[in-house]
Amino acid sequence: MGKQSMKAREAKRAKLVAKFAEKRAALKVLISDVNASEEERWDAVLKLQSLPRDSSASRQRNRCNQTGRPHGYLRKFGLSRIKVREACMKGEIPGLRKASW
């Protein structure tokens, strides 16, 4: 089980990413705009750097919804491989069954 504090930290990061997404995108467009002046682009870089670190999407980590496990995460189910296997064996996931060939 992942610590509750780690789960809370990830939830906080998700909120920050959503809050600053538009602002970040606008600044990145301005930074990559070759028609903008160097001064405007540099100001945009400084503004981007002044945003909270956790508002960057790359700081988020996918975690299992049940256990908080960060590794072996399967996006399709939102669970770790271990919990997917357990649910599969119990028949809780429709259409999913153990492979046999």
Curated annotation (Swiss-Prot):
Gene3D superfamilies on file: 1.10.287.1480
Keyword list, A-Z: Ribonucleoprotein, Ribosomal protein, RNA-binding, rRNA-binding
Highest taxon listed in the record's lineage: Bacteria
Pfam families the record matches: Ribosomal_S14
UniProt cross-references to SUPFAM superfamilies, sorted A to Z: Glucocorticoid receptor-like (DNA-binding domain)
GO MF terms held by the record: rRNA binding; structural constituent of ribosome
Keyword Ribonucleoprotein recorded: yes
GO terms for biological process, alphabetical: translation
Role according to the record: Binds 16S rRNA, required for the assembly of 30S particles and may also be responsible for determining the conformation of the 16S rRNA at the A site.
HAMAP family in the record: Ribosomal_uS14_1
Family membership: Belongs to the universal ribosomal protein uS14 family.
Protein name: Small ribosomal subunit protein uS14
Gene that specifies this protein: rpsN
